[in-house]
């Protein structure tokens, strides 16, 4: 007797298969599912994930992520009760597709009614709960590093009390201290955590850069000393964690939630000076990485993308605008630049990633630039279908 093990259904029925008898405790969760489910499915199809993986990814979204997305945003209605750090508009959910490695990813900040009502004023409960449930489903998710940085970078109960009692009204945005990401690959998942030390900085008086560097140092990994030294030297980070250039601001630490020996750390900054010279400095660590042929090749491609996008150079405000959901940003809005560096004991220099933010730019112009760049890379199939793919979402 043969037992079939493959799940088979027409692609258009994959969402309906899970939706037909789904139950949600409130309308917000139902609406999150109806919005995110089809979009995730389409992205998985575009990335050519096997159908059985598409269904399991959808099921994970429905059962484990949707319950932690909070109030569903509606254009023209009251602002969201919790303004997330994950996206420009404060929405706690972001889908993305890593084209180079063909990995679909969900970035999100787990929320609950406790955070939205102010009871959990710094949203410490939902991320912990959600991640613990994820770890129960997949034994490749290791929480050792997560626990370490929780202890180092989240406000303590005493610090939380002082912030609420002594610091006056806290800003609407920036109160979140943690975000998560789930990547779908090889038929399973991997997870990452992100720590925003802004509230810890406000409570302790220590700079975000100092808090992040101290938390890394407390891991006591000898192999990290050299890459951290090169990073600090290139960014001009002083003993107090402040860069000598005040336009640069450390603000975020990312960590892979896998076994500690494989876990990478990512150190994030924003830069208010947006220019090609700054991009080149960040990519090469002020020239230190140029001896690496991959660095030079990457710099050439970066220059090509920079020229194609025609991002206006200049100095940007670092004040986070209060965008209204569903409305475009002002025509004169220009975002800061972002970068991160991956710190690994196995590498002398940290590996950079540069974020050329296009919020506020014309979408058609950006798409034309990306199509031209994909052609430069030899990704002809993607170049020929990219605009139609984007328009279909």
From Swiss-Prot:
Belongs to the tryptophan dimethylallyltransferase family. It is an enzyme of class 2 (transferase). PANTHER family: INDOLE PRENYLTRANSFERASE TDIB-RELATED, PRENYLTRANSFERASE ASQH2-RELATED. One of its GO terms (molecular function) is prenyltransferase activity. It catalyses: 12alpha,13alpha-dihydroxyfumitremorgin C + dimethylallyl diphosphate = fumitremorgin B + diphosphate. Substrate binds at residue 94. GO terms for biological process: alkaloid metabolic process. Its EC number is 2.5.1.110. This is 12-alpha,13-alpha-dihydroxyfumitremorgin C prenyltransferase.
């Amino acid at each position: 007797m043969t037992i079939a093990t493959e799940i088979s259904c027409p692609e258009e029925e994959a969402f309906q298969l899970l939706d037909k008898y789904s139950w949600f405790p409130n309308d917000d969760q139902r609406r999150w599912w109806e919005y995110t489910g089809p979009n995730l499915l389409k992205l998985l199809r575009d990335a050519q994930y096997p159908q059985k993986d598409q269904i399991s990814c959808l099921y994970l979204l429905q059962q484990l992520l949707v319950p932690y997305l909070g109030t569903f945003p509606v254009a023209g209605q009251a602002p969201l009760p919790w303004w997330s750090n994950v996206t420009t508009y404060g929405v706690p959910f972001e889908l993305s597709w890593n084209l180079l490695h063909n990995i679909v990813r969900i970035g999100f900040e787990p929320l609950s009614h406790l955070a939205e009502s102010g009871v959990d004023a710094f949203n410490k409960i939902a991320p912990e709960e959600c991640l613990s449930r994820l770890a129960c489903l997949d034994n490749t998710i290791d929480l050792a590093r997560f626990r370490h940085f929780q202890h180092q970078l989240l406000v303590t109960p005493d610090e939380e009390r002082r912030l609420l009692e002594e610091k006056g009204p806290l800003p609407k945005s920036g109160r979140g201290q943690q975000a998560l990401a789930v990547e779908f690959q090889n038929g399973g998942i991997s997870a990452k955590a992100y720590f925003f030390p802004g509230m810890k900085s406000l409570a302790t008086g220590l700079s975000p850069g100092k808090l992040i560097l101290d938390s890394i140092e407390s891991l006591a990994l000898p192999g990290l000393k050299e890459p951290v030294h090169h990073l600090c030297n290139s960014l001009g980070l002083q003993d107090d964690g402040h860069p000598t250039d005040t336009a640069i601001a450390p603000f975020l630490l990312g960590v892979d939630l896998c076994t500690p020996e494989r876990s990478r750390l990512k150190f994030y900054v924003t830069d208010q000076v947006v220019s090609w010279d700054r991009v080149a400095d960040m990519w090469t660590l002020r020239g230190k990485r140029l001896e690496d042929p991959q660095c030079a090749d990457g710099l050439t491609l970066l220059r090509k993308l920079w020229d194609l996008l025609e991002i206006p150079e200049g100095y940007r405000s670092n004040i986070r605008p209060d965008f209204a959901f569903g409305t475009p940003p002002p025509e004169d809005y220009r975002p800061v630049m972002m970068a991160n560096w991956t710190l690994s004991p196995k590498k002398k220099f940290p590996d950079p990633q540069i974020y050329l933010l296009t919020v506020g730019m014309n979408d058609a112009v950006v798409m034309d630039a990306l199509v031209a760049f994909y052609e430069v890379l030899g990704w002809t199939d993607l170049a020929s279908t990219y605009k139609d793919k984007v328009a279909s979402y």
